[in-house]
């Protein structure tokens, strides 16, 4: 009988800790005034902890590209600050990706509302 893999529980804890720490670092550690209000929504970590994809959203959609530049510019600083806060053998390389799921959800909701409004009411 195979033993259940226990690595996923640790991986989940690590990614949750990375997400919490990065959210705090982005909120307090980014000194660039061009950075808008950034929310860290999710972090995905590879099994060997060498890479972490950070999914984020911004309050002001017009600042999306500028925010991406700010995060890319601050990537090394954020990683070194993360290394001070988290005790891991290997601190993952950070990759930032805009989280479009919120926009897709809002668009889908608007489409559903539109179809519901156009549908004739049946008795």
Curated annotation (Swiss-Prot):
NCBIfam families per UniProt: rbfA
Annotated GO CC locations: cytosol
Major subcellular location class: cytoplasm
Protein's job: One of several proteins that assist in the late maturation steps of the functional core of the 30S ribosomal subunit. Associates with free 30S ribosomal subunits (but not with 30S subunits that are part of 70S ribosomes or polysomes). Required for efficient processing of 16S rRNA. May interact with the 5'-terminal helix region of 16S rRNA.
Cell compartments where the protein resides: Cytoplasm
GO terms, biological process: maturation of SSU-rRNA
Keywords of the record: Cytoplasm, Ribosome biogenesis
Signal peptide (from-to): none
Gene: rbfA
Xref: Pfam families: RBFA
GO molecular function, one term: ribosomal small subunit binding
Residue stretches in coiled coil: none
Protein name stated in the entry: Ribosome-binding factor A
Keyword Iron among record annotations: no
